């Protein structure tokens, strides 16, 4: 199967991948293309920009959390009704789980998808030396097709031309455009990285202006040519994560989605929907009650610490959720969702805001990142998603710390080495119907995660 596709990779973090990927996606959409956008790795924030730019949900591609077949199935799933695929990389092109073990790198994903790569180089502090960087990236792994280069943070057109000529002369790689250094093209950041698109603001205008700028200095026709000349796609795997025909809804699951909670892998939502759950979105910040006739609740990660005052003040929603838990409704909460279920959130200024109190203890924001990285875990006790003994893969990234309450642990950590044997996650509720954890799970690691959530939600409320 032939399908136009391109990978936008950087030589490092802060190369401008999200800026250029979002602007390029929007520029392609303005030309009438239906872009299937993807983000390499476990990040939640960048996919929001690609979703906004493409007006279509962005999927994460992760070759460490997912098997080759599962990752490829997610890729094919995202191609439906699209005419070109754009994949934004993660960190530098060759950066992955570790230097000794493959997995998770942009290069590996490009190789698995047989996709050409456009390499981004931030030239703000160099000139001809940019050629050495490109040459090194080309030679490190000849299996990776670096088909072109985009230069970011050029000081002037003359600066760009100096770098372009050196790269094309010494690295024999075409340079297909640039972006000038411009503080107005910088996406705002906070402690977890870029600001989320769920926080509103003028991001749509920002992305459209970015697309206009990219049209003027980057050869998009050349990018389309590279994408169309990509070799045939690898064979489509047999369906495992998504049924060939979506199931009719058998239950409703309420999904928290607003400024406080927006971290969901699109594949998780699609798997729930395709296997028989009607998803009903609600806002713990703004709504006073849950959607009607639901059988389960899914509260993802996000920035509850930023919206702590609003979450704390919304007593009707807190009362509704507390009652749902007491009634035995299955509730799954990840990271920010876990914080919402705790007694209170203590923010960076040491101000405490009362939360649901389903989970004993206070979630305290730390002055530095508390834990980060890929994680492998064994299910220690049966819960609403998985059975004891099941092995799962996920990602942890949080600034808060919650003292371990005296509740039944959900998982035992198997990886990374410094956390082996530690407990992670909590099973609470009179009927052990609530699962809360800092571990972000991609349901593609095991399709039974989605199926089990649907089954137990159906037992609580059938439609």
Swiss-Prot record:
Gene Ontology biological process terms, A to Z: cobalamin biosynthetic process
One of the record's GO molecular function terms: ATP binding
Catalytic activity field: cob(II)yrinate + 2 L-glutamine + 2 ATP + 2 H2O = cob(II)yrinate a,c diamide + 2 L-glutamate + 2 ADP + 2 phosphate + 2 H(+)
Listed EC numbers: 6.3.5.11
UniProt-annotated catalytic positions: 335
Residues under site feature: Increases nucleophilicity of active site Cys: 440
Keyword Nucleotide-binding part of the UniProt annotation: yes
EC class of the enzyme, as a word: ligase
One Pfam short name: GATase_3
Cofactor: Mg(2+)
Extra remark: The a and c carboxylates of cobyrinate are activated for nucleophilic attack via formation of a phosphorylated intermediate by ATP. CbiA catalyzes first the amidation of the c-carboxylate, and then that of the a-carboxylate.
Domain notes: Comprises of two domains. The C-terminal domain contains the binding site for glutamine and catalyzes the hydrolysis of this substrate to glutamate and ammonia. The N-terminal domain is anticipated to bind ATP and cobyrinate and catalyzes the ultimate synthesis of the diamide product. The ammonia produced via the glutaminase domain is probably translocated to the adjacent domain via a molecular tunnel, where it reacts with an activated intermediate.
UniProt family annotation: Belongs to the CobB/CbiA family.
Functional summary from the UniProt entry: Catalyzes the ATP-dependent amidation of the two carboxylate groups at positions a and c of cobyrinate, using either L-glutamine or ammonia as the nitrogen source.
Protein name from the UniProt record: Cobyrinate a,c-diamide synthase
Organism for this UniProt entry: Dehalococcoides mccartyi (strain CBDB1)
């Amino acid at each position: 199967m032939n399908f136009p596709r391109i990978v936008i990779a950087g030589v490092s973090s802060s190369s401008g991948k999200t800026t250029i990927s979002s602007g390029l996606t929007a520029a392609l959409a303005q030309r009438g293309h239906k872009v299937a956008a993807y983000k390499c790795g476990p990040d939640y924030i960048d996919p929001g920009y690609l979703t906004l730019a493409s007006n279509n949900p962005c999927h994460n591609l992760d070759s460490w959390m997912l098997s080759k077949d599962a990752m490829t199935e997610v890729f094919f799933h995202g191609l439906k009704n699209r005419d070109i695929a754009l994949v934004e990389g993660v960190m530098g092109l060759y950066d992955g789980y570790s230097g000794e073990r493959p997995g998770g790198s942009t290069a590996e994903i490009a190789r698995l998808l047989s996709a050409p790569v456009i390499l981004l180089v931030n030239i703000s502090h160099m000139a001809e030396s940019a050629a050495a960087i490109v040459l090194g990236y080309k030679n490190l792994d000849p299996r990776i097709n670096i088909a072109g280069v985009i230069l970011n943070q050029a000081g002037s057109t003359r600066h760009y031309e100096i770098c372009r000529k050196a790269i094309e002369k010494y690295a024999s790689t075409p340079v297909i455009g640039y972006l000038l250094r411009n503080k107005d093209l910088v996406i705002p950041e906070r402690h977890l990285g870029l600001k989320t698109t769920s926080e509103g603001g003028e991001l749509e205008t920002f992305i459209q202006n970015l697309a206009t700028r990219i049209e003027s200095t980057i050869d998009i026709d050349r990018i389309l040519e590279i994408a169309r000349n990509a070799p045939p796609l690898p064979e489509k795997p047999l369906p495992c994560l998504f049924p060939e025909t979506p199931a009719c809804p058998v239950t409703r699951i309420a999904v928290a989605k607003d400024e406080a909670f927006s971290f969901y892998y699109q594949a998780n939502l699609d798997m729930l929907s395709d296997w028989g759950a009607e998803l009903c979105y609600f806002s713990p910040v703004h709504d006073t009650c849950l959607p009607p006739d639901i059988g389960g609740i899914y509260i993802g990660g996000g920035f509850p610490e930023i919206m702590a005052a609003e979450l704390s003040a919304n007593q009707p929603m807190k009362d509704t959720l507390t009652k749902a838990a007491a009634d035995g409704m299955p509730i799954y909460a990840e990271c920010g969702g876990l914080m919402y279920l705790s007694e209170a959130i203590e923010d960076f200024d040491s101000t405490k805001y009362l939360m649901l109190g389903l989970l004993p203890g206070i979630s305290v924001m730390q002055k530095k990142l508390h834990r980060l990285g890929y994680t492998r875990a064994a299910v220690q006790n049966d819960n609403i998603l998985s059975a004891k003994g099941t092995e799962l893969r996920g990602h942890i990234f949080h600034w808060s710390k919650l003292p371990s309450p005296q509740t039944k642990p959900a998982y035992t950590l198997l990886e990374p080495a410094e956390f082996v044997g530690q407990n992670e996650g909590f099973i609470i509720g009179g009927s052990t119907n609530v699962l809360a954890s800092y571990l972000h799970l991609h349901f593609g690691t095991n399709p039974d995660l989605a199926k089990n959530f649907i089954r137990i939600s159906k037992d609580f409320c059938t439609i």
